[in-house]
Amino acid sequence: MPVGTRRHTSTHFTPVEVAVEAAQFLCGGAWENPKILDVGSGMGKFCLVGGAMFEQAHFTGVEQRKSLCDVADQLLEYSELNNVGFLCGNIMNVKFSDFQGVYLYNPFYEHLQPFSAMDETIELDADYYEIYCGYVRKQLQRMPKNTRVVTYFGGGEEIPLNYDLVKQGFHNDLKCWQRR
């Protein structure tokens, strides 16, 4: 784990029990072999848990921080899962149309609360929060019927009006959405 990251585990990284429930919802939809996108995947816990649970699905994590991408790649190599992959880059370079499900653990929050930043490797700005949420919302709006999205924490700014909230859990912090 990168230096300084451990103190952020409860704030920035998905608890295993949340990953299990989120993966179950995302893989339980209309697609036989769903492709799931994890936005802001960090060290890849959600993707690795989901990939271990659902061999027929494929999980892709996208993360901006190279140090976290490196850890995710190491964990993936150790896990020997062949249905998980990680991209190191910006979410605005990802085509959501390649996926049938999306997992969002409040990936842009630190742009609003710089004091909660994990490190100083990416530029933080409240404008980026709006830009990234807007990009995700537009991408989700264009997705086909039955696309599934799970949000953990966050205010749901990324969720377009053409999605229904179909399930909640973990004190209503976990929300499961489906495209109409």
Mark where each language-model region is:
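A short SAM/SAH-binding and catalytic strip from SAM-dependent methyltransferases
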Residues: F99-F115
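Conserved short alpha-helix immediately C-terminal to the canonical SAM/SAH-binding motif I
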Residues: S67-L68
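Conserved SAM-binding loop of SAM-dependent methyltransferases across substrates and taxa
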Residues: K45-Q56
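Conserved class I S-adenosyl-L-methionine
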Residues: E32-G42
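Conserved SAM-binding motif I beta-strand of class I
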Residues: H58-E63
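S-adenosyl-L-methionine
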Residues: M1-W31, V71-D98
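C-terminal substrate-binding/active-site "lid" region of AdoMet-derived donor-dependent transferases
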Residues: H111-R179
